Curated annotation (Swiss-Prot):
Signal peptide: none annotated. One of its GO terms (molecular function) is ATP binding. One of its GO terms (biological process) is tetrahydrofolate interconversion. This is Formate--tetrahydrofolate ligase. ATP binds at T50, P51, A52, G53, E54, G55, K56, T57. PROSITE patterns: FTHFS_1, FTHFS_2.
Length: 535
């Protein structure tokens, strides 16, 4: 690794060092960069993933490295890892092989403290809510109708439903409560969407915490706590910069999940990156049905920058899986069947007005016959593609991909799935039927009740669907390209601070659980404090 000062092309007055290899950028760097034009934004998405993921982050990093090798002024912008997946199923989120961001262990394990700051600000509000009710409840908050949860950056299913204040009066007001993982916290979404401190504080104040006894919504600003919450996030709003394995600057900031949140790194990081670099590569969580849709329908609407190219990551193993084969066993016929999922994502991206470049992320047990089968399908359908060896060869393995992405860059005008003035129920239905392939949408009794409140007070909010990442549908068991199904809306969260409602589809959980053999079993330190086993 190089000292971070060697690769950041901005004066030292505009960033603070966190050791030799990490820096936090000050927001006033935008004054320094104000006369710079935006560069070209390249978004990396994927086909419907297997549990281990398809290498979207690895591809984004490799693409950034390749652009540098081609002599381009390039950077990347990705999300910060959550401890939940690090210790759970998926492992770390810093790429892999020869396409990583460094120092990877530091980045994976709490980094510069942004996640703990989000958790602290979030839980401060939770503490103040209960404290307000304990000390007389001037706002007449209904303890049975508090909708703001608590948060922790860990997978822990035992916290999905809890009771607080269950002792004597000294333990506070007894009520039902729950935890969400920090990546699904509304405060995390607010941090990712805020462009300055004033907007941050305003959004925090707009968080709806619940209802009073007269059924009127109550907000964080009513408790006069949003300023204190913002004080905990002063440094967290500042984007972090590290570096790739080939010394490309990497903006790594905020970490909302793509399935239960909006799934992209911060808008502020994108703005700064697009001013610093001619080409900025970013990524959106999970498949094009999740993070990509939310990037178009939410992030681009809130921003003044444009998206210039889209990369769609595909793998042979994912096509084996969607074709009914075994993930690690070569099977050309399964790949041919599973390619329907890939082609569905190609067409889905085109619905939004973009022509993607498919990056086939090659794995060691992919056979030539399988690669050729996919290549023939893409060629037959006129889809630009490249075989990416970013994992094994770093930037050199993504040079062909980089060249094709550069050729694909265009002044695209996105086509949004819904209008901001559409009825909230119509917004949800348009996403379900136009993006998820559903025949119809069914709202539960609880969802219908919440929808009435939304129509009265929050009809102008965006929609951020929470659903499984393992299927285009709301049912993780329906692989490949399911048809003829009904999307079930089992509840709706109102995140008025972040500016969207979150319909809860199928059996989606905002607090994951650990698997039978969590990744934490493999992580250790040696006698010198070196971390091992973090993948």
């Amino acid at each position: 690794m190089k000292n971070i000062s060697e690769i950041i092309n901005i004066p030292e007055d505009y960033y603070d060092l966190y050791g030799r290899y990490i820096a936090k950028v000050s927001l006033n760097v935008l004054d320094y960069l104000k006369n710079k034009r935006y560069g070209k934004l390249i978004l990396v998405t994927a086909m419907t993933p297997t549990p281990a993921g398809e290498g979207k982050t690895t591809t984004a990093i490799g693409l950034g490295n390749a652009l540098k090798l081609l002599g381009k002024n390039a950077g990347i912008a990705i999300r910060e890892p959550s401890l939940g997946p690090c210790f759970g199923v998926k492992g770390g989120a810093t790429g892999g092989g020869k396409s990583t961001v460094e120092p990877s262990n530091k980045i994976n394990l709490m980094f510069t403290g942004d996640f703990p700051a989000v958790s602290a600000a979030h839980n401060l509000l939770s503490a103040v809510i209960n404290n307000h009710m304990y000390h007389g409840n001037e706002l007449k908050l209904d303890p049975k109708n508090i909708v703001f949860p608590r948060t922790i950056d860990m997978d822990d299913r035992s916290l999905r439903s809890i009771i607080v204040g269950s002792g004597d009066r000294s333990t506070g007001v007894m009520m039902n409560d729950k935890y969400v993982i920090t990546a699904a916290s509304e405060v995390m979404a607010i941090l990712a969407l805020s462009r300055n401190y004033n907007e941050l504080k305003q959004r925090l104040g707009n968080i709806m915490i619940g209802y009073n006894l007269n059924k009127a919504p109550i907000f964080a600003r009513d408790l006069k706590v949003h300023g204190a919450m913002a004080s905990l996030l002063v440094d967290a709003l500042r984007p972090n910069i590290a570096q790739t394995s080939e010394h490309v600057p990497a903006i790594i900031h905020t970490g909302p999940f793509g399935n239960i949140a909006h799934g992209t790194s911060s808008i502020l990081g994108d703005i700064i990156g697009l001013k610093m670099f001619d080409y900025l590569v970013t990524e959106a969580g999970f498949g094009s049905d999740l993070g990509f849709e939310k990037f178009i329908d939410i992030v681009l609407r809130l921003s003044d920058f444009k998206l210039s190219a889209v990369v769609l990551v595909a793998t042979v193993r994912a096509m084996r899986y969607h074709g009914g084969g075994r993930i690690n066993e070569p099977d050309v016929n399964a790949v041919l069947r599973g390619s329907e999922n890939l082609m569905w994502h190609v067409q889905n991206i085109k619905k939004f007005g973009f022509n993607p470049v498919v990056a086939i992320n090659r794995h060691s047990n992919d056979t030539d016959a399988e690669i050729n089968a996919i290549s023939n399908i893409l060629t037959k359908n006129g889809v630009e593609f490249s075989i990416s060896d970013a994992y094994s060869d770093g930037g050199h393995g993504a040079l062909d991909l980089a060249g094709k992405v550069l050729k694909s860059i265009s002044d695209y005008n996105p086509r949004y799935i819904y209008g901001i003035n559409d009825d909230p129920e119509e917004k949800i239905s348009k996403i379900a039927m136009n993006v998820y392939n559903a025949n119809s949408v069914e709202f539960s009794h609880d969802a219908v009740k919440t929808m009435k409140l939304i129509k009265d007070d929050f009809s102008d909010l965006y929609v951020c669907m929470a659903k499984t990442q393992s299927s285009i549908s709301d049912n993780a068991k329906l692989i490949n390209v399911p048809e003829g199904f009904t999307v079930k809306i089992n509840g709706i969260n109102i995140n008025s601070g972040s500016g969207f409602i979150i319909p809860l589809l199928g059996n989606i959980m905002t607090m994951p659980g650990l698997p039978r053999r969590p990744a934490s079993e493999n992580i250790d330190i040696d006698d010198y404090g070196n971390i091992t086993g973090l993948q």
